[in-house]
A protein has these predicted regions:
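C-terminal binding/interaction regions
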Residues: 95-155, 250-325
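Polybasic, low-complexity association/targeting segments
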Residues: 1-26, 131-167
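Acidic-glycine-rich active-site phosphate/pyrophosphate-binding loop
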Residues: 3-9, 34-54, 107-110, 175-194, ...
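Ordered, small/hydrophobic-rich secondary-structure cores
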Residues: 39-110
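Conserved phosphate/anionic-ligand binding catalytic regions in large, soluble enzymes, centered on
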Residues: 64-72, 200-215
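Gly/Pro-rich interdomain helix-loop hinge
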Residues: 82-90, 220-259, 267-274
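Short glycine/serine- and small hydrophobic-enriched flexible loop segments
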Residues: 36-40, 75-82, 135-139, 177-181, ...
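A short glycine/serine-rich beta->alpha loop
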Residues: 17-25, 56-64, 118-123, 158-166, ...
């Protein structure tokens, strides 16, 4: 997807951009800012979603992969549609999520945080994705995107999705279940992670079990930054090359740093945080899906989800009570 040449035709919405900029000045990190901005624009009171995104800045636990300007809108598409709304053989979140990613790439040429931010100390390249993501989300939310996924890829995705449903497995939801959540008691939480399957909508990107663990860290123990002076200090420290991610600098830093520590453990155990690298399968290709199914790669995915949930639980052992939604 990231090699496709697409033209951005997004009409600017200055009210959305103004709201996003105001939130960015108070919060300082991408994923929580985008989450807060879309919640504000949608008049939704769900602060738990901001906590859920607390560890996601820097490309999911500061690993440099999917930008927070993508992951937060995908969470909110899940809240809107879950896996309940189905178009043919796939939930509509695949159509909408794919369309959202296409539009994001049209604006920013990539989904990857590290490619967007570059090597500049001051994160000036991160500002446009934060400002534009809410209007991309709103543009995608109620549209018809049934043709967004090319037919060949859609057939491959449909076969893989049927295989996972038959085996009652969803990467992100499996981690949540191991952490003590349940679809019956926490339906919105399970909806929120709908897109995080097969490395984000079967795109083979960041392992969705890992993503769910980082989200759980934020949900259970995350704090929310809301201070312009503290964000100015954060940016100043970044610009001069200091340790801007010290946990005393910004309240989101603790969750992000925990996510990064989880990433180091995950990479040691699995060799990568990237689904396609771990599985050795390209899910957009029917041959890749056949490889995954016929060689029973699912068994390893189930084991990884279980073991990673145990690691997350260890990290949060001092957090004895669940944070209510």
């Amino acid at each position: 997807m990231e090699n496709q040449s697409l033209k951005s035709e997004l009409a600017p919405n200055w009210a959305y951009r103004g709201q996003s900029f105001a939130n960015l000045l108070r919060m300082g990190h991408c994923a929580p800012t985008v989450m807060r901005s879309i919640l504000d624009i949608s008049s939704m009171e769900k602060e738990w979603l901001v906590r859920l995104s607390a560890g996601m800045p820097g490309g999911i636990g500061n690993t440099g992969y999917e930008c927070g300007g993508v992951t937060s809108p995908l969470v909110l598409l899940g809240i809107h549609d879950g896996l309940r709304q189905v178009d043919g053989d796939l939930p509509v979140i695949f159509d909408k999520g794919y369309a959202l990613c296409q539009q994001f790439i049209a604006c920013h040429q990539t989904l990857r945080c590290k490619e967007i931010r570059g090597k500049d100390r001051f994160p000036r390249h991160c500002i446009p994705p934060v400002l534009l993501s809410p209007e991309i989300f709103m543009n995608v939310l109620d549209g018809d995107h049934g043709q967004a996924i090319p037919a060949g890829e859609r057939a491959a995705y449909s076969r893989l999705y049927a295989h996972l449903v038959e085996n009652e497995f969803h990467c992100a939801q499996a981690v949540l279940i191991h952490l003590g959540y349940s679809p019956a008691e926490d339906p919105e939480l399970f909806d929120a992670v709908s897109a995080f399957i097969g490395g984000t909508l079967f795109m083979g990107k960041t392992c969705s079990a890992f993503t769910a663990g980082v989200m759980a860290v934020g949900l259970r123990a995350g704090e929310i930054e809301n201070s312009i002076p503290r964000v100015i200090r954060l940016l100043t420290i970044m610009t001069v090359g200091g340790n801007a991610f010290d946990e005393s600098i910004n309240k989101f830093n603790q969750s992000m740093n925990r996510g990064y520590r989880l990433a180091k453990w995950f990479m040691k155990e699995s060799g990568s945080t990237q689904c396609q690298v771990i599985t050795g399968c390209d899910f957009s290709d029917p041959a890749g899906v056949s490889n995954y199914i016929e060689n029973d790669r699912l068994t390893r995915c189930k084991l990884m989800a279980s073991e990673f949930a145990e690691k997350v639980q260890q990290m949060l052992a001092d957090e004895s009570q669940r944070v209510p939604l």
